[in-house]
Amino acid sequence: MKTGYFLLEDGNKIEFELYPEAAPGTVANFEKLANEGFYDGLTFHRVIPGFVSQGGCPHGTGTGGPGYTIKCETEGNPHTHEAGALSMAHAGKDTGGSQFFIVHEPQPHLNGVHTVFGKVTSGLEFAKNMSNGDVMKEVRVEG
């Protein structure tokens, strides 16, 4: 099983598991970016209480990415946008890259539109209580 964590600058830790069987390309991309240090020092630039905490933009504005895009993996993916889901942000089908979000409360309207590739297993309260601009000190994937 692939697991990992977001270590926030304030010392709080959000732990997660990933779903490589449901979203192999998305998980491989996220793991590569995390373990290369791409996310280290980036912010959660879009935090909407009761909805999502979104991060992974190198510009901190929601307009950037890694310089490439990945395909959506929604077809046949059994995972839904329940509380704690990790999902890829995008500007339209197959335009995701590095931006992702953590779901605060169930968001069924996102099912089949965004790729769920994991779930928070510990520390969801830290995602729900963060503010725009909170920094990811370190993000890693293990296993």
Curated annotation (Swiss-Prot):
Pfam families cross-referenced by the UniProt entry: Pro_isomerase
Gene field: ppiB
Domain PPIase cyclophilin-type: from-to ranges: 1-143
Reaction(s) this enzyme catalyzes, per UniProt: [protein]-peptidylproline (omega=180) = [protein]-peptidylproline (omega=0)
GO MF annotations in UniProt: peptidyl-prolyl cis-trans isomerase activity
One of the GO biological process terms: protein folding
Protein name: Peptidyl-prolyl cis-trans isomerase B
EC number: 5.2.1.8
Xref: InterPro entries: Cyclophilin-like_dom_sf (IPR029000), Cyclophilin-type_PPIase (IPR024936), Cyclophilin-type_PPIase_CS (IPR020892), Cyclophilin-type_PPIase_dom (IPR002130), Cyclophilin_A-like (IPR044666)
Stated regulation of activity: Inhibited by cyclosporin A (CsA).
GO cellular component: cytoplasm
Lineage summary: Bacteria, Bacillati, Bacillota, Bacilli, Bacillales
Location in or out of the cell: Cytoplasm
Main location per the UniProt record: cytoplasm
Annotated keywords: Cytoplasm, Isomerase, Rotamase
The protein's role, per its UniProt record: PPIases accelerate the folding of proteins. It catalyzes the cis-trans isomerization of proline imidic peptide bonds in oligopeptides.
CDD domains reported for this sequence: cyclophilin
